[in-house]
Amino acid sequence: MTASPATALENSVESNGAPMGPSEAVAAWVAMFADGWANPVDADSFCDHFDPWLDDEVRMIQPSIRPVVGKRAFREEFARPLFDLVPDLHGTVDGWSATGHVAYIELRLEGTVGKRKFTMHTCDRVKIRDGRAVERFAYLDAAPLIKAVLASPRSWPTFIRSQLRSLRRPT
C-alpha cells in the first residue's frame, strides 16, 4: 500500500532537511497509480483507491469520450462504464518519466470483453499539484478494445449505453 498524498508530501524531505523535488512526489503518485491498476476488484474499489490522490475537480481527457471532470464523474462516467464492459480489467505500468510536476506513464491494459481477451497500450500524461492529479490526458489507440467489443455481441448494449451517455454529457 502506498502513502496518502499528504504523507507523501510530509515525507518529501531529504535526510539533510532539504525539500525533495517534484519528481519524488510524482514517483509516489506513480507508485499509487501502479497499485491501483494492478488488481482492481470493481469500479468502486478502483475509485476508492484513487480518490485521495485526485483533485476534487480533476479533468480526465481521452479519445472517443468527452472530458470527465470531478471525482464523482470519474466514478460514474469513467470507471463504472469501463468496469461494466471489462469486469476483469487490470493494468501494468511498463515505464514512466517525469518532468517537473508532470508524469508520463506507459500503461498496458488487459481484460476480457465477453469471451474476447484484449491488450491495449496507453500513455497517460498526469499533471500533479500538491500530491494530487489535476489533469490526466490519455494517448491511446482503443482499436483492441473496439475489436473485442465488435466480436462480442452481448457487450454491444453496454458499450452503446456508455457511448450515448458520453455524447449527452456537456463538454
Model-flagged regions — what are they?
Residues 2-18, 81-171:
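A beta-strand edge to alpha-helix "cap/lid" segment located at domain peripheries
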Residues 8, 14-56:
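Short acidic-aromatic low-complexity motifs
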Residues 27-34, 47-51, 75, 147-150, ...:
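Generic detector of well-ordered alpha-helical segments enriched in charged/polar residues
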Residues 30-37, 54, 74, 78-82, ...:
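Hydrophobic alpha-helical core bundles mediating ligand binding, dimerization, or RNAP-core interactions
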Residues 36, 49, 54, 75, ...:
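Solvent-exposed, well-ordered amphipathic alpha-helical segments
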Residues 47-101:
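A solvent-exposed, acidic/Ser-Thr-rich amphipathic alpha-helical stretch
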